[in-house]
Amino acid sequence: GAKGTAKSVLARSCAELAGGRRLLTLPLNVTEDMLFGSIDIEYAVSLGEKRFSPGILARATDNILYIDEANLLRQELLTAVLDANSAGVNNVERDGISCRHAVRTTLIATMNPEEGTLPPHILDRFGMYVDVQALTAVQERVEIMQRALAYSRNILDFRRRYAEETQQLAAKLAAARELLPQVAASD
């Protein structure tokens, strides 16, 4: 969706509804070492031994990995994240270290089509695509801005204020997750 459609706010709210899972943000300037992991330099210098230091992908396991402006991320890194998440494993072979760890993350990505789009073969790898339209009603836009500001001013107060609504929605999502294994796609 376009700028100002609260895509980032919506993505952050997913963590609140996901039963204690954390939201980790993948920065656009991420390096391969930051993403996949690398040698723990401090450990190597102080003890003279090589040790693997997990990257963002390892920390995102059992959590939510958020990519804001995914269309601006280097495409080879985005493809590698999608590959690892699809395979359920990240294999790291670098600097004399061989490491393998599980990857089980919920991936949420946003993009502003004004700044370019993702190729269809990349979009196809996401489970769902939602086109967010900009709100034109002034009252709705004001409400979104007020809530975003309230959240940034005092997160705990914001959570208390909307706790009942959040709990109700989280319960609905939990019930839907329970039903999901019983869902069969028709021909």
Regions found by a protein language model. Give the residues of each.
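Walker A/P-loop
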Residues: 1-28
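Conserved Walker
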Residues: 2, 45-56, 70, 87-103, ...
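Conserved AAA+/SF3 P-loop NTPase catalytic/coupling segment centered on the Walker-B
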Residues: 10, 31-32, 58-85, 117-125, ...
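Short glycine-/polar-rich loops that comprise or flank the Walker A/P-loop
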Residues: 19-21, 61-62, 87-89, 103-105, ...
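Conserved AAA+ ATPase "SRH/arginine-finger" region at the nucleotide-binding site
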Residues: 24-27, 129-139
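Short glycine-rich substrate-engagement loop in P-loop NTPases that contacts/grips substrate
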Residues: 28-60
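Basic, amphipathic alpha-helical bundle interface domains used for macromolecular binding and assembly
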Residues: 136-137, 142-187
